[in-house]
Design a protein with these regions (language model features):
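N-terminal, positively charged/glycine-rich alpha-helical extensions of SAM-dependent methyltransferases
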Residues: 1-12
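A short acidic, Gly/Pro-enriched loop at the edge of an enzyme's catalytic core
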Residues: 96-107
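Core SAM-dependent methyltransferase catalytic element
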Residues: 175-188
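Conserved SAM-binding loop and adjacent beta-strand
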Residues: 11-31, 151-153
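A short glycine-rich, Lys/Arg-flanked "PGG" loop and its adjoining helix->strand segment in the class I
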Residues: 121-133
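Class I SAM-dependent methyltransferase SAM/SAH-binding core
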Residues: 43-45, 49-97
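A short SAM/SAH-binding and catalytic strip from SAM-dependent methyltransferases
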Residues: 106-119
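Conserved beta-strand signature within the Rossmann-like core of class I S-adenosyl-L-methionine
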Residues: 134-141
Length: 188
């Protein structure tokens, strides 16, 4: 599976969080499918301007917004403050060294981000470190061409094989418009 390793520029944050996207792809629609427990710690990896972070935080005990870009994190933090959502921790990381305790996370969510991860093997190892046993890694990627996604189309079988090599098992894949929601569980 090819990875660009080029994160989305903060100058394009408007395209990640705008009224048209909210009509077509409301963040609450995806978050409802995740079955988040009120005691969960949920990570929004590659959070960008916080499009999904706020909804995660509303469902979970605590949300952790992780992004490589300090500019994106500032946008997400400003958005959280305006929304009055205070249970979010903001961390800058490329994913190879996330400043969280071992086995402290219930859910890691990546929405059209995994294809941008440069060091996927190291990132999967880090996810494995911070995930609790039998917790969830949820990856949303484009699996067929559509008019609203600029992200490259991913091969579902290649994605499954790569993630499963990182100590996770695919439990379910839900097609949603032109994306696939891949639910992985950390192996014990």
């Amino acid at each position: 599976m090819s990875h660009k390793g080029h994160p989305y520029s903060a100058s394009g944050a408007f395209f990640l969080d705008n009224p048209i996207r909210r009509l077509i792809q409301p963040p609450s629609e995806l978050i409802e499918k995740l079955a988040i427990n009120p005691n969960d710690v949920a990570v929004d990896f590659g959070c960008g301007p916080g499009y999904y972070t706020i909804e995660l935080a509303k469902k979970a005990k605590r949300a952790v917004a992780v992004d490589l870009s300090s500019e994106m994190l500032k946008k997400a933090q400003n958005k959280a403050e305006k929304a009055g959502v205070m249970n979010i921790q903001f961390l800058q990381s490329n994913g190879t060294n996330i400043q969280l305790e071992d086995s402290s996370v219930d859910i890691i969510l990546l929405v059209t981000v995994y294809h941008e991860v440069g060091e996927s093997e190291a990132v999967l190892k880090e996810f494995n470190r911070i995930l609790k046993p039998e917790s969830k890694l949820i990856i949303v990627e484009v699996i067929k061409k559509g008019i609203f996604h600029g992200a490259p189309v991913q091969n579902p079988e290649a994605l499954k094989a790569e993630i499963e090599s990182g100590n996770c098992k695919l439990e379910q894949m839900l097609p949603q418009k032109n994306t696939g929601i891949f639910f992985f569980t950390k192996k014990t």
